[in-house]
C-alpha cells in the first residue's frame, strides 16, 4: 500500500481505502503473510474475458477503420459478458468528443446501444435470468430502462428496427446507434456502434449512420463464416 500511495501520489489512507474496495470486489487479494497485495480472481476473469475476444477484435479492425472514414464519427466494437458489455476496439475520428468506451472498459449492457443490440438477440428467458429484479438495472445519469418490462419494450423495438439506439444514457449530450453481428448459428456475439452528438440526430443523419454501421456489421459477420482455404500447391 505504501508503494502504491507513493507511485500515485496519494495519501496512504486513500490508498488503503481504494485497496479495501478493490479487495471487496475481488479485484485485489491481500497476502497477509507477505504484507503485499496482488491481483484478485475478478481481475484475472476480466483479463481472460478480454483475451478470449482479442482475435475477434483483430478481425474487425479494418472494417471499423473504414466505417470511421465513411461516417466521420467514433466507432466501437463490443461483446456481451453477462449484463455488461466489454469494449474490445475503438476507432476515433478527428474532431469528435472523447468517449468512456476505451478498450477493456465495462459498462452496463442495458444502457449502451451495443448491449441493447446484443440483448435483443437473446431468448426472453435468458434476458429474464440476467435481469431478475430492479436492482439489476444500474443507472448512470438516471436514464435508461429500470424494469424488465421497460427493457423488453426497448428490445422489441430494437428487433423491429434492426438496430439499437441510446440517447444520453452513457454520456450526456451524446447518442449512439449499434447493429449486432450475427454469426451462422443466429447468435449475436458482438456489436458495432457509432457515437455522435445528440444535437446532430436528425432522421436523415441517423438513417445514414445506421446504413454504414449495418454494412460494417454484415462485413464482419461474413468474415466469421468458415471458408475453405485453397492449397496454393494444388
Question: Model regions: which residues?
Answer:
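Amphipathic alpha-helical regulatory segments at dimerization interfaces
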Residues: 7, 58-70, 157, 161, ...
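Short, solvent-exposed cationic patches
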Residues: 109-112, 207-226
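A structural signal for short hydrophobic beta-strand segments in well-ordered beta-sheet cores
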Residues: 28-30, 77-78, 181
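N-terminal helix-turn-helix
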Residues: 1-58, 218-226
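Cysteine/selenocysteine-centered motifs that mediate thiol-based redox chemistry or coordinate metal-sulfur cofactors
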Residues: 126-141, 217-234
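Amphipathic alpha-helical effector-binding/dimerization core
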Residues: 33-34, 38-134
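Extended hydrophobic
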Residues: 143-217, 234
